[in-house]
């Protein structure tokens, strides 16, 4: 029996050429091998593999349960990706010509470029940070044919947030940021307490609802029936709170600025609630990001900064964002937005919260190093690759816009997402491998890796070329483009494997996959050098880059944690996380050590970050697990 799939004639011709040119290995890397396209073969392979990540053509550490739901979701991915590539090729050909379409398909197939979430790339956007203002004022306004009304109490509002997260998560492929969740939860909580609706302990009431929300977003079938909802919650120091919410009002018309102290206290309650829950039930979401103003050598809101750093000592579960201006903001596990550059900054507060990305397409920087004769050749090739990447992203954006016009993405019609507030994102990976290939790294007598001065300068030139090329490209466009150092959950291994096939004598294979840090976590170096390099290149990544600073154990003292955080901020590193290994028993209690203090059971798995948020190592792919075993961990308590 033959099943007809109608594809563009030109695309079919080029697709067949790619299969012939690159062979079975690359077909499998792309998810287009016979066994991946065959549903029966896929089912057999899925059953035999240890984890979903090893069976998927586009794995995610957030998908941990291997069951019928994940089987049914993963099975058609190759076909969805094939249809998406057909659409992109067709539209690229129309807008930029036949040669450009062919160049893209070759670059994507050979893994010079990597389009993330490719199977949904023409169907839904990547990520967005949503304001909950309308939800707080009107209720479930996004549900069609539903007579909605506003929440009157905290419990109802939390239920509304759960529905909101489920709705938005299923209409995007990436994160759902909730930067103003805390002020609105505080509003409903304080009204319930002050009105006498809730007459028992107010703290208990708050913590119960915080727990309800955390358990809901970690329910493993909220998104696409196979994974929990990738959510991020923001916490701010006083200068940020004033800047972002100073011009905003609660649903009853009361200015948020009048409740600044209450909002600050509720932030602390939420963070403490998250911390307590981890001991009982280790979880992944929401990702917590704490933003501080650090200026002239000190934290402006030192009281909150000290409280937050002390709080973070237990689990190191918050990502820390420092800036000398409120025009920069973190909305995601690594997403960093320069609000002024992106045109979304409002001095009276509020509008800066709604920002996101349409799609991410990554440039394999290591590949260019293997192709190049020297630095100048590298930079010329890089410029061409960036231009091609920008054309692809522009085309995908056009397709998403058409989907909106056809009413296929109601989250845009509802006003939840504004396409004008989303940028296209150039992903990068392979900075370390590029420097190693050029001979721009060195070892000290203790085996620590350092970047040479040539690496520092070459890195600057690489980022300058990327930035100048994208700025030139968008001169006649009505949107912005950002640069992001990607997590590379799935991409890092596939790109390295492709380069190993094509450049077996040149490929840098210090680790089983390419690093998602400027110095990968499996490469031995000093904490100071890791911070120095991240500080040097961090500012170029206006779409996100987070430095992971691996600790073999939590800080012993607040003074150590405080001094280290101040040092990092003083070096100009804006976004970072102290990363630990959190053990979990079979009952999912979080702890440090070999035996669970709650139930006495031994370690069943460990939680740590790939990028941005903690996930159980047992759900990772084989290559990721190998990389985890090779990671270096700093002893900060010696």
Task: Tell where the protein language model's regions lie, with residue ranges.
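Conserved catalytic cores of very large enzyme subunits
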Residues: 2-420, 441, 447-452, 456-597, ...
């Amino acid at each position: 029996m033959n099943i007809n799939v109608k594809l563009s004639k030109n695309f079919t011709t080029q697709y067949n050429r790619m299969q012939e040119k690159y062979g079975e290995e690359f077909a499998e890397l792309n998810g287009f091998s016979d066994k991946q396209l065959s549903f029966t073969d896929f089912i057999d392979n899925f059953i035999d593999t240890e984890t979903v990540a090893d069976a998927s053509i586009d794995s995610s550490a957030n998908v941990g349960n291997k069951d019928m739901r994940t089987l049914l979701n993963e099975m058609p991915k190759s076909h969805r990706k094939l249809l998406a590539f057909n659409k992109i090729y067709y539209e690229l050909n129309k807008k930029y010509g036949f040669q450009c379409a062919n160049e893209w398909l070759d670059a994507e197939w050979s893994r010079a470029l990597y389009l993330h979430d490719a199977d949904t790339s023409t169907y839904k956007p990547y990520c967005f940070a949503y304001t909950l203002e309308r939800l707080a004022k009107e209720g479930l306004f996004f549900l069609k044919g539903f007579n909605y009304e506003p929440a009157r109490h905290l419990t109802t509002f939390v239920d509304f947030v759960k529905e909101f997260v489920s709705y938005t998560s299923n209409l995007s492929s990436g994160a759902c940021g909730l930067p103003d969740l805390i002020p609105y939860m505080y509003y409903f909580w304080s009204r319930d307490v002050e009105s006498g609706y809730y007459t028992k302990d107010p703290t208990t009431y708050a913590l119960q609802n915080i727990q309800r929300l955390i358990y809901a977003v970690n329910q493993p079938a909220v998104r696409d029936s196979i994974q929990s909802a990738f959510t991020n919650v923001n916490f701010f120091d006083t200068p940020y709170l004033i800047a972002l919410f100073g011009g905003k009002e609660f649903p009853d018309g009361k200015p948020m600025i009048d409740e600044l102290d209450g909002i600050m206290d509720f932030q602390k309650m939420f963070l403490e609630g998250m911390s307590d829950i981890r001991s009982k039930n280790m979880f992944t979401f929401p990702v917590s990001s704490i933003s501080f103003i650090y200026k002239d050598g000190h934290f402006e809101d030192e009281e909150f900064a000290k409280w937050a750093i002390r709080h973070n000592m237990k689990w190191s579960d918050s990502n820390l964002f420092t800036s000398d201006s409120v025009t920069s903001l973190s909305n995601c596990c690594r997403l960093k937005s320069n609000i002024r550059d992106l045109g979304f900054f409002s001095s009276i507060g509020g509008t800066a919260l709604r920002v996101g990305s349409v799609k991410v397409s990554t440039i394999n920087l290591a590949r260019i190093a293997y192709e190049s004769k020297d630095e100048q050749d590298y930079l010329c090739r890089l410029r061409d690759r960036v231009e091609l990447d920008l054309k692809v992203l522009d085309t995908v954006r056009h397709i998403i816009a058409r989907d909106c016009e056809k009413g296929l993405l109601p989250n845009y019609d509802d006003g939840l997402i504004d396409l004008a507030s989303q940028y296209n994102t150039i992903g990068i990976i392979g900075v370390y491998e590029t420097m190693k290939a050029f001979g721009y790294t060195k070892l000290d007598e203790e085996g620590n890796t350092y970047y040479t001065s040539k690496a520092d300068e070459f890195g600057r030139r690489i980022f300058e070329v990327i930035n100048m090329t994208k700025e030139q490209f968008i001169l006649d466009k009505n949107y912005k483009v950002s640069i992001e150092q990607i997590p590379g959950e799935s991409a890092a291994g596939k790109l390295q494997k492709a380069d190993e096939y094509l450049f077996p004598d040149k490929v840098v294979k210090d680790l089983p996959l390419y690093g998602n840090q400027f110095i990968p976590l499996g490469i031995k170096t000093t904490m100071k050098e890791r911070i120095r390099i991240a500080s040097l290149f961090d500012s170029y990544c206006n779409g996100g880059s987070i430095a992971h600073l691996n600790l073999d154990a939590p800080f012993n003292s607040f003074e150590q944690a405080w001094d280290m955080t101040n040092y990092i901020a003083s070096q100009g590193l804006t976004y970072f996380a102290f990363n630990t290994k959190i053990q979990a028993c079979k009952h999912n209690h979080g702890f440090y050590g070999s035996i669970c203090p709650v139930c006495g059971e031994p370690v069943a798995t460990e939680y740590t970050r790939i990028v941005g948020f903690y996930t159980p190592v047992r759900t990772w792919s084989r290559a990721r697990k190998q990389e985890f075993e090779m990671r270096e961990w700093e002893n900060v308590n010696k």
